[in-house]
A protein has these predicted regions:
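RNA-contacting regions in translation and RNA-metabolism proteins
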Residues: 1-213
């Protein structure tokens, strides 16, 4: 229904110049829609908002004053989520593709705005993007990363029989399992300044032996 209202109010949507790719609603209270322009010269958000907000206001009035956030769609999931979290500003984001979740860090003073009343903002952003979103303060996010890296370092020390420094570098560079060490390309490994070729070959050898054991 929300999408149909925009088709009526925004000619560019009806003409296919702008696509509405998704919508998430808390009926009567708030909604988020994602838009994409098929014409590089056309500002999708500006067209949907209308002059002085006239178009989006007309849609809002039809829905008992429902507040509508118009979000720019992006093929990069992280960028799309950052857009969807508006009006909160995302400081950092950690993507877990396996769990299809993201940890989102915002400034302490923006935490309540990012989460929204009763979790509304993050819930709608999650529904719109299709990702599980965990919002936290920057300090909490940094502490979580530090704790996870420490845990991974211990795993690498034990599983690969390496010293603390090597284990710390593996964790810091984003390796999350022995499997990833085993099957990482030489090109990716060579981008790590702390490792020379001899160490890389030894790490891969130990990782493969561990997996096949």
């Amino acid at each position: 229904f929300l999408v149909e209202l925009f088709k009526l109010e925004v000619p560019e949507v009806g003409q296919g110049l702008i696509e509405i790719l998704g919508a998430a609603r808390d009926p009567g209270l708030r909604a988020k829609i994602s838009v994409k322009s098929n014409d590089p010269k056309l500002d999708a958000i500006g067209a949907c908002v209308g002059m002085r907000g006239s178009r989006v206001q007309s849609v809002s009035n039809e829905l008992s004053g429902e507040r509508i956030d118009i979000i720019m769609w992006d093929e990069d999931p992280a960028k799309f989520v950052i857009n969807a979290m508006s009006p909160a500003e995302v400081l950092s984001i950690v993507v877990d593709e396996e769990k299809k979740s993201m940890d989102i860090a915002v400034a302490e003073e923006q935490l309540s705005q990012a989460i929204g009343r009763g979790g509304q903002n993050v819930r709608l952003a999650s529904e719109l993007t299709g990702w599980d979103l965990n919002v936290m303060s920057k300090d909490d996010a940094d502490n979580k990363i530090m704790e996870e890296n420490q845990n991974l370092s211990e795993v690498f020390k034990e599983e690969l029989n390496v010293d603390q420094d090597v284990a710390d570098v593996l964790a810091r560079e984003g390796f999350s399992s022995v499997d990833e060490v085993a099957y990482c390309s030489m090109e990716e490994f060579n981008s790590i300044d702390d490792f020379d070729e001899e160490l890389i070959q030894e790490l891969r050898k130990r990782a493969i032996e561990k997996i096949e054991a």
